[in-house]
Amino acid sequence: MNPELAPSIEAAEREYLRSRVENLAQVSGNPFGARVFYNGDYPCFHVGASSSPMLNRIHGDLVGDPGAVLDLLKGSAQHSTVTPLVGKPSTLGPVAFIEGTRLERLKGWTHLQFVCAIDTMILSRHSFDIEDATAETFALFAEVHASGFHTKPEHRALNQASFAEQAASGRLKIYVLKAVDEVVAGASMYLASNGVAYLGTAATRKSARGLGYHAALIAHRMEQAKQHGCRWVAATALAGSQSRRNLQRAGLRVSHGQALYRLGEGWSAK
């Protein structure tokens, strides 16, 4: 684990996910029931219309004030909120405890966090047509993303709205890759306030996989991060995934592991 960079990587990811929930909360009438609030300096959020661990998280200082995290988990349990624990992957076991209360690790939500300095990245050359999403191509990005991640039809409007930045911060970037004038892949990037460019979601149409589009989107976003003055690039991937291999070829290295935990069965609200 990289003790110096790990907090910055986690902060960048929190900021990225918070921004997506803020986008939902700012839709007129807040139809998705999105809420963002804070535990000290740490953003927390949940979305009534979605049980996704991406959008329902409690953050906080687990060393200095673990009780605050525990209280917020209990107070928002109806939203299936989770909290991330970080460390060496081997230490992130199936069970953890906060002040004696049992937490259980979510299956399929243990990832590696990657990072590299902007001046050590390895940009691969490609000839693909990658551009910033426009009003027209943004909807196509959302379609590709929903298809790639098997988003249920009833959740597709929510998913698309979470990427549609409502504020004028300009921190959330969406890119699309075209082949023969058709959007076949896309990716997001968030320019965090701490100088870290967080490489968010990337997806490719099933019929277009294996052609190098994912690697090209990594390279493009890293190049864009440099142009925006970022000092670091960070990303998340499963340990055995092609995403991990593509990130490492681009110069990113494993910083630490992250696993998501929620309250164990049988906890009492009393």
Please place each PLM-identified region on the residue numbering.
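A short helix-loop-beta-strand connector motif used in the catalytic cores of GNAT acetyltransferases and
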Residues: 28-37, 78-81, 165-175, 185
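Conserved GNAT acetyl-CoA-binding A-motif
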Residues: 77-89, 225-238
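Acyl-donor-binding surface of acyltransferase catalytic domains
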Residues: 61-129, 133-138, 243, 259-264
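Short amphipathic alpha-helix that is part of the acyltransferase structural core
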Residues: 1-23, 57-62, 110-111, 119-161, ...
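N-terminal charged segments
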Residues: 1-75
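Conserved acetyl-CoA-binding loop-helix of GNAT-fold acetyltransferases
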Residues: 65-73, 200, 204, 210-227, ...
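Conserved beta-hairpin
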Residues: 36-39, 90, 96-101, 171-185
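A conserved beta-strand-loop-helix scaffold within acyl/acetyltransferase catalytic domains
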Residues: 153-206
